[in-house]
Amino acid sequence: MGEVVGAAILAHVPTIMLPEATRLDLNEGKEISLVPGLKRFRKEVMETLDYDTIVVLDSHWATTVEFVVTSAAERSGLFTSEELPRGMSQVPYAMKGDPELANAIAKYDEKN
């Protein structure tokens, strides 16, 4: 296992997944402020760090009352959001997992 080289708490809104033209149309021709903020974060932080894994804790995934840690070596499929299906419908995803890291995180589980 390596070390933590960075951490961030980032805001997000489901509309970020809409096409740019749709976002502009919904926001009187202006981009939502989150988009340039995330681009700046990528340039100033993500592109400057030496990392190999990103851990995302998000309240909009399969559960809102607990965190689920999956130890799959790879996950892929099509995602449709329950909150904003018109913006996130059948979005393909394929990403590598890190079973070793997932199991290390799971060791800190609080038993209910």
How would you describe each model-predicted region?
Residues 2-111:
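A short aromatic-anchored loop/beta-hairpin motif
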